[in-house]
């Protein structure tokens, strides 16, 4: 059953919450025809990260943008939440929607979750687009090494309870005054309204716990992700979209998915949050790639 939007929305979008894997996920749908696409946000984001990408894709596709467990208007995450749990959440969401294999698009910290999903449930995935994404075991741990230029917040986010302790009442300041400005190359790409929408749900008690589960996964799951990669589990076509991180995403995916075709594109002039900074170019890259994959599947 559709629900009223609890925060911001876009014209024509349908909001829903669905019971999967012992939790409830909030997702937003747009578009009535074409092959289905599942969009998975990063940090410090929610489904809203794709609010300008969705209308472009919905011209040809049925588009679904999900709030991961512990994020947005989905249920909170518990102590057991990690990338494996998140991947199963998404697998059960795809199954429940009943629209066949989906084109998976994920970015940033959701990379480990998306990689697990594509590797362990290949029948559920038609293609895999990675936007500004790293993986544990393939160099992402370096971002936590503050002695060599890593990000201070990485360890903070990976430690349950510490984000609530330090950021309570400062959610908008952290998101809007630090996180986005520090990694965006396009001024004002993330406006005050966007910041308010992201901060709205991080401000709930336990609102950072979803992020904690995914950041902790990066620090402890490297061997498991490398083992998946070495099994050549990724067989669907892959598109690596780089922006502020340059060719890092391309290099990661070519090493992690050696058994399949990995294409790449660079979004010049955009920073890390490419879907917010250059939504039309990101949407066009996804649309063109998905269109080619669909055509090959039909042929």
Stretches found by the model and what they are:
Residues 2-17, 23-27, 36, 64, ...:
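Flexible "cap/lid" subdomain of the alpha/beta-hydrolase fold that forms the substrate-access gate
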Residues 21, 44, 84, 280:
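Conserved phosphate-coordination/catalytic loops
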Residues 28-73:
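Conserved HGGG/HGGXW glycine-rich cap/lid loop of the alpha/beta-hydrolase fold
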Residues 32, 41, 52, 80, ...:
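Residue-level detector of alpha-helical segments with a strong bias toward transmembrane helices
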Residues 46-47, 112, 271:
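A short, glycine- and basic residue-enriched loop/turn
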Residues 48-51, 55, 88, 115, ...:
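Surface-exposed alpha-helical interface segments used for non-catalytic interactions
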Residues 270-279, 283:
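Catalytic histidine-centered segment of alpha/beta-hydrolase-like enzymes
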């Amino acid at each position: 059953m559709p629900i009223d939007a609890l925060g911001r929305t876009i014209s024509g979008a349908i909001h829903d919450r669905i019971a999967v894997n012992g939790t409830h996920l909030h997702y937003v749908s747009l578009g009535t025809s074409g092959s289905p696409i599942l969009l998975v946000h990063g940090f410090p984001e929610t489904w809203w990260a794709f609010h300008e990408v969705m209308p472009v894709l919905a011209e040809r596709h049925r588009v679904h943008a999900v709030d991961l467990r512990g994020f947005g208007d989905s249920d909170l995450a518990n102590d057991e939440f990690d990338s494996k749990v998140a991947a199963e959440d998404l697998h059960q969401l795809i199954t429940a929607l009943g629209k066949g294999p989906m084109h998976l698009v994920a970015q940033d910290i959701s990379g480990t979750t998306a990689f697990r999903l594509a590797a362990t449930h290949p029948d559920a995935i038609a293609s895999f687009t990675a936007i500004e994404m790293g993986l544990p075991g393939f160099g992402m741990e370096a971002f936590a090494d503050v002695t060599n230029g890593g990000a201070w917040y990485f360890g903070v986010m990976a430690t349950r309870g510490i984000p609530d302790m330090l950021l309570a009442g400062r959610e908008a300041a952290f998101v809007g005054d630090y996180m986005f400005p520090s990694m965006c190359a396009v001024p004002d790409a993330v406006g005050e309204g966007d910041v308010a929408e992201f901060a709205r749900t991080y401000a709930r008690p336990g609102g950072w716990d979803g992020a904690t589960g995914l950041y902790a996964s990066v620090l402890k799951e490297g061997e498991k992700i490398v083992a998946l990669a070495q099994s050549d589990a990724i067989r669907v076509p892959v598109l690596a979209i780089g922006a502020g991180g340059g060719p890092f995403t391309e290099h990661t995916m070519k090493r992690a998915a050696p058994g399949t075709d990995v294409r790449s594109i660079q979004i010049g002039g955009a920073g890390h949050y490419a879907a917010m900074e250059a939504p039309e170019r990101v949407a066009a890259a996804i649309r063109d790639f998905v269109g080619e994959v669909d055509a090959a599947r039909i042929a």
